[in-house]
Amino acid sequence: MIGRNSLVKLIDYCYREPLMKFRIMKEKGFSLYTTGNSYPYIFMVDGRIPHGGMFDRLKGLITIYAISKALGKPFKLNWSYPFVLSKYLEPNEYDWLIDESQMNFGLLSYNNVIAYGEIVDPSRLYKKRSSETHFYYGYNSLDKVNAHFGTSYQWGELYRELFRPTTYLQRYLDLYQSEIGANYIAIHTRFMNLLGDKTETAINPELGSDSQKSALVEAAINAVKKISEQHPNTRILIASDSMVFIEEIKKAKLDVYIVPGTVKHIDTAGETDDSENIKMFTDYYLISGAQKVYSLWHEGMWKSAFPEYAARIGNVKFEHVEF
């Protein structure tokens, strides 16, 4: 594993990063050196490389923010793909806003760090850099950051320092919160392609028959019922990547609440519309306000980061349940 990781680091440093500089030069025009007033660390979600799902991006972002705090470096966030983040989230205690027109793209006056190979040992991320640096990263390395710098940062606390819902998003949160009430648990499932939704890359195959799909859906609904029995008189927020499952659980005799809208994976979809973005943000903010959060898993399903990290935002108890 370490040997493979070292190879990926080498590819990042010797191939991906120079290629990104060449691509930027073609897009922006040639500039050898540009001076600036500050030299921030900028986390990039710009669609120029794959970024992963919502919480892959947030995991990487929080890691780089923690490092910037530890090193005393300004931190900014350039999130424009597949939507502009500032439509839905705004700075809370720390101003991370920056426009790409304000960024430094002089060939010799900025660095980019594409850090696919840093998951095991993120040593390249720890370096204090004197020039503006654009980071591409998708992992939670906060424990390693704390160990390296002697800090005690908490993921949810850092998230809350950075973000709060915009007035636009808050209107939807207030509406759906009023519908579900205050007394609820949250249950999340991630089937990916198993039920035939085809909203994901080919990480896992679609089940081969309708009977297999029906059996998996029935088993998942029974798992929801078992959890419900542990929480009498409590509503259940259901969040899932499968519209097939959502339509089936609506038919079950359970007090479930489902945020209206369609689910898409923000990296594989290529683009999302406003209603899909609202559903994603509302799902994870409502999850963060639940009494407890559960993630259901069965062989072939994906152990999603979405519910676990949403729970961290609200400092809510989280449990994986295998069925």
Report each predicted region and the residues it spans.
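Short, aromatic/basic amphipathic alpha-helical patches
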Residues: 88-97, 101, 244-255, 307-312
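Catalytic donor nucleotide-activated moiety binding site of glycosyltransferases and closely related
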Residues: 188-196, 218-272
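Structural motif
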Residues: 184-185, 235, 292
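Secretory-pathway glycan-assembly enzymes, especially type II membrane glycosyltransferases
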Residues: 13-209, 214
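A short glycine/serine-rich beta->alpha loop
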Residues: 47-52, 272-273, 292, 296-297
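Acidic carboxylate-rich catalytic motifs and surrounding loops in phosphoryl-/glycosyl-chemistry enzymes
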Residues: 75-82, 234, 238-243, 297, ...
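Residue-level detector of anion-binding/catalytic polar loops
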Residues: 74, 255, 292
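A donor-sugar binding/catalytic signature common to diverse glycosyltransferases
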Residues: 62, 278-323
